[in-house]
Amino acid sequence: MIYLPDGVQDFLPEEYKFKRKIEEKFREVFIKFGYQEIMPPTFEYSDNFSVLFDENNLYRFFDKKGNILALRPDVTTQIARIVSTKLKGSFPLKLCYVANVYRYDDPQVGKMREFTQAGIELIGTNHEESDAEIIAVAIEALKSVGIKDFKVDVGQVEFFKRVVEDLELQNEEINLLREFLQQKNQSAIEEFINDKGIRGKKAKFLSELPLLFGGEEVLKRAKELYDTPKLGETIDYLERVYRILKDFGMEEYISFDLGMVQNLNYYTGIIFRCFVKGIGYAICTGGRYDGLLGIFGEHIPATGFAISVERSMLALQKQKKDIIDKSWRVLIKYKENLRSNAYKKATLLRGEGKIVEMYSYEKAKHVDENSFDEIIDMEE
């Protein structure tokens, strides 16, 4: 068999150089904001993941002792475990990572079964400054690799939760409504409203919920449509986060989507997704997950995000943006008796940051000299 299974890919030298450069730039931004890099294991006990992920989406296997293990589908869950068991102490704690994750999803353009995420986690704070910082770091990371024409859609999990609480819906109805909102399927929502006998202000608000996306004016519109104390608190929080981002000069990147619901069920507060113009899927997702560490025994607030490196590559390729610095390539051709001198010269040039290949004259006959910027002959 010479073919690959669905959902994985090879990265050839130039592609991999491109990918590594993106990872390096993301990592550099994270570190400059005070985040320390961490690397959890590639696989753990399946139970550590199955509490949040459907087992059908995990790559699971047995070890020789009969334990059920799984390749990590997510790094945030691992960091929650690590902080709860090994990093108790002073907070806030700032951690970052660049790591491959594995999910048994249906492969499609921009969605693989093995992919690389670059992300950060800010643990131990639960105020608007930390949520604003997370969004700001995501924006700075995308800017650092040269991605243009992107927007960060910001929502709030509590917004949806408080709407369904007010409507007194059952779990099955909540899941159905969540699916309709994910699809922005307004006709299905209208049908849902009629079937459930929802009337008046609640019906009007619910029918407009998938349309509540755009600029700062969306928050004002939401208050006008359905002004309750609980929803008012949620909107006020979003307004405070937005004011901080305006102080950072980032308002041009921010939009709001109050009908946003996320697939990962560990989010508890603010959520966001980054979209690039012309690409129909998010390249970055994040939000607050104050309940996740409690699964591992420590009730500590936290927020973070993950950027898809492969989707960032696709965005840059679509925008025809090249971020690879061209290295100066040198070919040294030498006589056999000058091999020592040739190697010393090559070492000197490599110390200057140049790429150097050296071949004896006999071997150099088979080398494509056009691929080099400089050729040095060492004949005497």
Swiss-Prot record:
InterPro entries: aa-tRNA-synth_II, aa-tRNA-synth_II/BPL/LPL, HisRS-like_core, HisRS/HisZ, HisZ. Belongs to the class-II aminoacyl-tRNA synthetase family. HisZ subfamily. It is found in: Cytoplasm. This function is generally fulfilled by the C-terminal part of HisG, which is missing in some bacteria such as this one. Required for the first step of histidine biosynthesis. May allow the feedback regulation of ATP phosphoribosyltransferase activity by histidine. It comes from the Bacteria. GO terms for biological process: histidyl-tRNA aminoacylation; L-histidine biosynthetic process. GO terms for cellular component: cytoplasm. This is ATP phosphoribosyltransferase regulatory subunit. Pfam families: tRNA-synt_His (PF13393). Heteromultimer composed of HisG and HisZ subunits. Disulfide bonds: none annotated. PROSITE patterns: AA_TRNA_LIGASE_II (PS50862). One of its GO terms (molecular function) is histidine-tRNA ligase activity. Keywords: Amino-acid biosynthesis, Cytoplasm, Histidine biosynthesis. Pathway: Amino-acid biosynthesis; L-histidine biosynthesis; L-histidine from 5-phospho-alpha-D-ribose 1-diphosphate: step 1/9.
